[in-house]
Structure formats: structure tokens, C-alpha cells
Design a protein with these regions (language model features):
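Generic alpha-helix initiation/capping and coil-helix boundary signal
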Residues: 1, 7-8, 116, 120, ...
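C-terminal cap of thioredoxin/glutaredoxin-like
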Residues: 2-4, 20-31, 154-222
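Bacterial N-terminal signal peptides
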Residues: 7-16
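Extracytoplasmic thiol/disulfide redox context detector
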Residues: 16-112, 171, 177-187, 222
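Short low-complexity stretches enriched in small and charged residues
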Residues: 28-35, 59-64, 120-124, 150-156, ...
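Short, flexible turn/loop "capping" segments at secondary-structure junctions
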Residues: 68-69, 116, 196
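Structural alpha/beta surface segment adjacent to cysteine/selenocysteine redox centers
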Residues: 76, 81-82, 87-157, 187-192, ...
């Protein structure tokens, strides 16, 4: 009996008589959804800009400015040394800041992807004490293949760093303080991935291949 009832129910549910007809398209509903999404996007953008504005001085200034420290427009990048998208965007970004002395470039070490990311960031921050941050940063960003601890220190030697001193400096409390500060800044502006850029006070995220840095700088100048 139960089997018969179940079979009957299945037939009824499958019956075209009982199947709900497709809802007619309603342009008013579609417009309401689009308006809502547009308003939400605008509000999210406004909220992000307000969060950035409240932290802008801290974001734009620090020990890891690698180009044009007196520039009038600042690009801040949150990055990870093992992030392929960060590495892919680096040549375009460096060409821009090296060709326009008005653009300051401030790096924010944000090691979120691998153990090697954290080692690399600690080493890079420690290299500041030997005046080699820019050279070491670029060497790590341009290093090919999988980044590991041996490769990090190989790059350090290649740019003239005293590796024994570097290892000691990596353990200093101020290195941890800087990384924690970067994570707090990222959390404060709702950055949870790499790369993320702030150009002239506006947060720019998305596929780094689609970001036109020159265009973003031009917008910031207006």
C-alpha cells in the first residue's frame, strides 16, 4: 500500500497539470533588483573609502616605501611574495612609478598564503635595517619558481645582505609589530586577499591584470 501511494505521489508531482507555469518576466522587478544592487555597490564603495580615509596616514607611511617618498600621489600595495597575481603586476607598477616621480609607492607586507610568505616578509622587513629593502623586495618578487626558505636567503645574498645579521634581525619584536600592524590595517579596510591597492586614497581590488594603474592615478589627480 505504501509503495502504491508513493508511486502515485511521484506521478502527481511529475504531472504537467500540477507543474507550476513559468513566471512571466516583470521588468519592474528586474529594475528593482538592479537598482538595489547599484545602491549597495555605491554604499559599499563609500564605506570602503571612509575606512581608508580614517587610516590613510598610517597606510601611506612606513618603513617600506620603495619609490618616490616625496611623491604627491601614493599607491599602497598589500601583497604576498608567493602571490602570482602580485608578481605578475609588479613590472607594470614599477615602470609607472619609476617613470613618474610624483607617484609614491608604499608596500604593505601581508603574508597570508604560505609559511614561506611569512619567512620572506620577516626577511624583507629585516632588510630595512641594512638599507636593502627595495633591492631585496624586487629580487623576491622577480624570483622564478616556488619560493622557499633556501631561495629567500639566496636572494638576500645576491643583493648584498649580511644573511647572519638578517636572520638575527628577523627575530626582533619590531618585525612582528610591523606585520601585526599591517594585518590590523588590512582588517580595518576590509582587505582579505592579495593583491589589493590603494591609489590616491581609493581602494582598488580585483584581477590585477585588469587594473590600469596609470588610469587609477589619473583619476586620483582629479
Amino acid at each position: 500500500m505504501k509503495r502504491a501511494l508513493l508511486a502515485a505521489l511521484c506521478l502527481l508531482l511529475a504531472s504537467p497539470v500540477l507543474a507550476a507555469p513559468p513566471l512571466p518576466a516583470d521588468p519592474r522587478a528586474a529594475k528593482a533588483v538592479q537598482d538595489y544592487l547599484s545602491q549597495q555597490q555605491a554604499q559599499d564603495s563609500k564605506d570602503r573609502d571612509e575606512r581608508v580615509a580614517a587610516r590613510l596616514d598610517a597606510l601611506e607611511n612606513g618603513p617600506t616605501v620603495i619609490a618616490n617618498p616625496q611623491g604627491t600621489i601614493t599607491i599602497v600595495e598589500f601583497f604576498d611574495y608567493t602571490c602570482p597575481y602580485c608578481k605578475a603586476a609588479e613590472p607594470r607598477l614599477m615602470r609607472l612609478v619609476d617613470s613618474d616621480k610624483r607617484i609614491k609607492l608604499a608596500m604593505r607586507e601581508f603574508p597570508i598564503l604560505t609559511r614561506a610568505s611569512m619567512i620572506a616578509s620577516r626577511a624583507a622587513l629585516a632588510s630595512v635595517k641594512q638599507g636593502k629593502y627595495r633591492a631585496f623586495h624586487l629580487a623576491l618578487m622577480r624570483r622564478e619558481g616556488v619560493l622557499d626558505e633556501a631561495g629567500i636567503f639566496e636572494s638576500a645574498r645576491a643583493v648584498g645582505l649580511d644573511v647572519n645579521r638578517l636572520r638575527r634581525d628577523m627575530a626582533a619584536p619590531d618585525i612582528s609589530d610591523e606585520i601585526v600592524n599591517n594585518f590590523n590595517l588590512a582588517r580595518g579596510i576590509r582587505v582579505f586577499q592579495t593583491p589589493a591597492y590603494i591609489v590616491g586614497g581609493h581602494l582598488v581590488t580585483g584581477d590585477s591584470a585588469d587594473i590600469n594603474f596609470a588610469k587609477e592615478v589619473a583619476k586620483a589627480k582629479k
